[in-house]
UniProtKB/Swiss-Prot annotation:
It is found in: Cytoplasm. Keywords: Amino-acid biosynthesis, Aromatic amino acid biosynthesis, Cobalt, Cytoplasm, Lyase, Metal-binding, NAD, Nucleotide-binding, Zinc. Belongs to the sugar phosphate cyclases superfamily. Dehydroquinate synthase family. NAD(+) binds at residues 70-75, 104-108, 128-129, 141, 150, 168-171. The gene is aroB. The lineage of its organism: Bacteria, Pseudomonadati, Pseudomonadota, Gammaproteobacteria, Pasteurellales. Pathway: Metabolic intermediate biosynthesis; chorismate biosynthesis; chorismate from D-erythrose 4-phosphate and phosphoenolpyruvate: step 2/7. Binds 1 divalent metal cation per subunit. Can use either Co(2+) or Zn(2+). It is an enzyme of class 4 (lyase). This is 3-dehydroquinate synthase. Its EC number is 4.2.3.4. Its cofactor is NAD(+); Co(2+); Zn(2+). Coiled coil: none annotated. Pfam families: DHQ_synthase, DHQS_C. GO terms for cellular component: cytoplasm.
Length: 362
C-alpha cells in the first residue's frame, strides 16, 4: 500500500492507494458506534456495496446507504436532495460520516452533501473509476451541474481520507478507463515532463490495466495534485492549471447534454484545442502538439470536436466558465509539454481558429 498526504494550511489527510483496501476494515478511520451513510449508485453497488458495509460493520459501525441514479445527467440538485432526505429520515446528526463510493459524479454530489448537511459532516472518498482516483476525489471540489453550465453550484470541502482500491478498475468499462487516462495525460502535460515521457513509454500497459504501472501512475497523479492543492486550495492561483482542456471540454459536455461524451473524452479534445491555441500563439511547437495527439490517440481518446458541434457553438458556453473574470475569457495553455500557464483575455478569433483545427472534416 502507498500513502500520499495532502498537506493543507490547517490540516492534512491521507490518500491510501493499494489492492484490496475496500475489504480491509483497517482502511476505515471509523470507530465502534459511529454512524455512516454510504452514497453510491446501482452499478457500483452490485460490485462493492456489500464489501464496504461488511468491513464497516466489523468495526462496529451503524451503516445506512442511499442509491443515486447512475450518470452525469443525474449530477443535479434533485440527486443532492435524495441524500438529504435519506440522512434526515435516518436521523443522522452532525457526527455522521458520508462515504462517497463511486466515480466522479458520486464523489461530487456526495461531497457537496457532506459540505451542506447540517453545515458540514465528515467525508470519506472511495473513488472507483480511474478518473476519480487520479483527479476528482482529491482536493475538495464538490458540485452539481446546472442546465446552463457544468459544476456551477458547489463548494470546496476536503475529505478526511481518500481510499483508492485499484481492484475496482477491473470492473470498469474500457471506455471509462480510457476517459480516466485523459486526466492522467493532463498531469504530465501541465506540470511534469518526465511523467509525460513515462506515459509515452507505458500508456499501453495502463490501457491494459497492468497493476504495477497503474499503481505508479495513480500515486504520481495524486502527488502532483496534492502538491498543487497544498499551494492553492481554493483555486486562486496555480490550481487553475489543473483545468487544461476543461473550458473547451465543459462546452462539449454542456452542448451535447451531460453524459453523451464522458468527461475525460471531452477533456481530451479540449486539451488538443488548448494545444492548438498554444501553437497559434507561438508557445508550443507543432511537434509537441503532435506528441500530445499521438498519446491521446493511443489511449483511445478523441482528439477532434464532435461532428454535431460547430466552432461557433463553443464560445457562448466558454464565457460562462468559472475562470472568466470581468467578462474576459481565461484559458489554461501550454508553454511547453510539462509547463502550463493561464492566458488572460485571449482573442476570440484565435480561439475559434484553434477549435477549427480540431474540427472533423470529411
Amino acid at each position: 500500500m502507498l500513502c500520499v498526504n495532502v498537506e493543507l494550511q490547517e490540516r492534512r489527510y491521507p490518500i491510501l492507494i493499494g489492492s484490496g483496501l475496500l475489504q480491509d476494515e483497517r482502511s476505515y478511520p471509523i470507530k465502534r458506534g459511529d454512524r455512516v451513510m454510504i452514497v453510491t449508485n446501482p452499478t457500483v453497488a452490485q460490485f462493492y456495496l456489500d464489501t464496504v458495509i461488511y468491513a464497516l460493520e466489523k468495526r462496529g459501525c451503524v451503516v445506512d446507504h442511499v442509491l443515486l441514479p447512475d450518470g452525469e445527467k443525474y449530477k443535479t440538485l434533485e440527486s443532492l436532495n435524495l441524500i438529504f432526505t435519506a440522512l434526515l429520515q435516518g436521523n443522522h446528526g452532525r457526527d455522521t460520516t458520508i462515504i462517497a463510493l463511486g466515480g466522479g459524479v458520486i464523489g461530487d454530489v456526495a461531497g457537496f452533501a457532506a459540505a451542506s448537511y447540517q453545515r458540514g459532516v465528515r467525508l470519506i472518498q472511495i473513488p472507483t473509476t480511474l478518473l476519480s482516483q487520479v483527479d476528482s476525489s482529491v482536493g475538495g471540489k464538490t458540485a452539481v451541474n446546472h442546465e446552463l453550465g457544468k459544476n456551477m453550484i458547489g463548494a470546496f470541502y476536503q475529505p478526511s481520507m481518500v481510499i483508492i482500491d485499484t481492484l475496482t478498475l477491473n470492473t470498469l468499462p474500457k471506455r471509462e478507463v480510457n476517459a480516466g487516462l485523459a486526466e492522467v495525460i493532463k498531469y504530465g502535460a501541465i506540470l511534469d515532463y518526465e511523467f509525460f515521457e513515462w506515459l509515452e513509454q507505458h500508456i499501453d500497459e495502463l490501457v491494459a490495466l497492468h497493476p504495477e504501472a497503474l499503481q505508479h501512475c495513480i500515486s504520481r497523479c495524486c502527488q502532483i495534485k496534492a502538491d498543487v492543492v497544498a499551494r492553492d486550495e481554493t483555486e486562486k492561483g496555480d490550481r487553475a492549471l489543473l483545468n487544461l482542456g476543461h473550458t473547451f471540454g465543459h462546452a462539449i459536455e454542456t452542448h451535447l447534454g451531460y453524459g453523451n461524451w464522458l468527461h475525460g473524452e471531452a477533456v481530451s479534445t479540449g486539451m488538443m484545442m488548448a494545444a492548438a491555441l498554444s501553437e497559434e500563439l507561438g508557445d508550443i511547437s507543432i511537434a509537441d502538439v503532435s506528441r500530445l495527439e499521438k498519446l491521446l490517440a493511443r489511449a483511445n481518446l478523441p482528439t477532434v470536436s464532435p461532428d454535431t458541434m460547430q466552432p461557433e457553438d463553443y464560445l457562448p458556453h466558454m464565457m460562462r466558465d468559472k475562470k472568466v473574470l470581468s467578462g474576459k475569457l481565461r484559458l489554461v495553455l501550454l508553454k511547453s509539454l510539462g509547463q502550463a500557464y493561464v492566458a488572460n483575455d485571449t482573442e476570440h478569433t484565435l480561439v475559434l481558429n484553434a477549435i477549427r483545427r480540431c474540427t472533423q472534416t470529411d
